[in-house]
């Protein structure tokens, strides 16, 4: 008998786990992630950049003020969005190829929109609630905006409003494709017996459309970063253990609050810092694998510790009493360590080649 097996019980299993996880592009910050992930019962996905590709493009631009020049309006929008960290902003910037206007007094309100002064105009860009906050209204003789945007929302597109001087000037439609692996990933998680939810700052129609395409029935929409955090907190106070997957600055509070937080590899720095693990390749298919791997690793760690204690508790008294021949004792020492090594390698069972 020997403490070697006890010393190997956890570190060796963690080493095998981290090797397998990193081979699928998952990096963890600490060994406690294994235990926490093995105990999860609910997975919450952010929408934009998580179950969608995070490569939005500007699909349509509708002018509500017909006196406006489309290119001028797009230039103003791109000038402000260039200062934003949100992926939606990149779609607007990418649609403009010219020079940008200088912007001052820029301010971003996470989950709602941005504002700033460009060309001596106090510009406001964001969602419908952000427009209401700034008392912006549509000009007279305009086609009902709801009728204009509904088909796009039902297709899962994001609607952005833009205006200044108390008047809505344009509606921008941004499209972001669903990740090809999202639906199968969700199905695998559901087969593991976990609940799956999508949360988003987008409106309910758009969020529900994307969620439906990803085979997710549980939808929580129009959430601010603090709202996402409070939603996670409320679930966990009710006894749930949450895995939160997100990519943006809007997800950072929720990633910190969750039992386990996983940041997409192409996400913002603050999201990466707030999470317990990072999905380096941004491949959602690794999530159910990671959950199953954590469960197997935690079981093996418990088995290793149990048998290491068992060997020592049984063999040490026998060795002290002289009932064990030294050669047999040496063999028992080697056997206990060998068992821990071989048992730790069992974590590989079910791992892809």
Predicted regions and their residues:
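Conserved ATP-binding TGD loop and adjacent catalytic N/P-domain core of P-type ATPases
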Residues: 120, 140-142, 148, 156, ...
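ATP-binding catalytic core of ATPases
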Residues: 62-114, 132-150
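A general beta-strand register signal
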Residues: 52, 108, 117, 124, ...
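Conserved beta-strand elements of the Class I
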Residues: 41-44, 124, 170, 243
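Conserved catalytic phosphorylation-site environment of P-type ATPases
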Residues: 5-80, 235, 254, 347-350
């Amino acid at each position: 008998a020997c403490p070697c097996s006890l010393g190997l019980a956890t570190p060796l299993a963690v080493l095998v786990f981290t090797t397998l996880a990193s081979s699928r592009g998952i990096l963890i910050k600490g060994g406690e992630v294994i235990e926490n992930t093995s105990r999860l019962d609910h997975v919450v996905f952010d929408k934009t950049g998580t179950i969608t590709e995070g490569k939005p493009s500007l699909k349509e631009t509708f002018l509500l003020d017909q006196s406006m020049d489309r290119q001028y309006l797009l230039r103003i929008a791109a000038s402000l969005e260039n200062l934003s960290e949100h992926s939606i902003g990149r779609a607007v910037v990418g649609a403009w190829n010219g020079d940008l206007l200088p912007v001052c007094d820029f301010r971003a309100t996470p989950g709602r929109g941005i504002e700033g002064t460009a060309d001596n105009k106090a510009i406001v860009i964001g969602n419908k609630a952000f427009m209401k906050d700034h008392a912006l209204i549509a000009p007279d003789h305009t086609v009902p905006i709801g009728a204009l945007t509904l088909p796009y929302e039902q297709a899962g597109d994001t609607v952005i409003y833009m205006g200044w001087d108390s008047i809505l000037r344009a509606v921008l439609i941004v499209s972001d494709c669903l990740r090809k692996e999202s639906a199968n990933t969700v199905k695998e998680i559901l087969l593991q017996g976990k609940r799956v939810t999508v949360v988003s700052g987008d409106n309910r129609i758009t969020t529900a459309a994307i969620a439906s395409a990803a085979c997710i029935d549980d939808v929580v929409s129009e959430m601010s970063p603090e709202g996402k955090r409070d939603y996670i907190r409320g679930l966990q106070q009710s006894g749930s253990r949450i895995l939160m997957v997100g990519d943006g600055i809007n997800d950072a509070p929720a990633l910190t609050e969750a039992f386990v937080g996983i940041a997409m590899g192409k996400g913002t720095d603050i999201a990466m810092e707030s999470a317990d693990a990072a999905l380096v390749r941004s491949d959602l298919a690794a999530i159910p694998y990671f959950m199953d791997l954590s469960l197997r690793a935690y079981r093996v760690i418990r088995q290793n510790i149990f048998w290491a204690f068992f060997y020592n508790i049984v063999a040490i008294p026998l060795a002290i009493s002289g009932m064990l021949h030294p050669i047999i004792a040496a063999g028992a020492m080697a056997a206990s360590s060998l068992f821990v090594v071989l048992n730790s390698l069992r974590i590989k069972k079910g791992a892809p080649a």
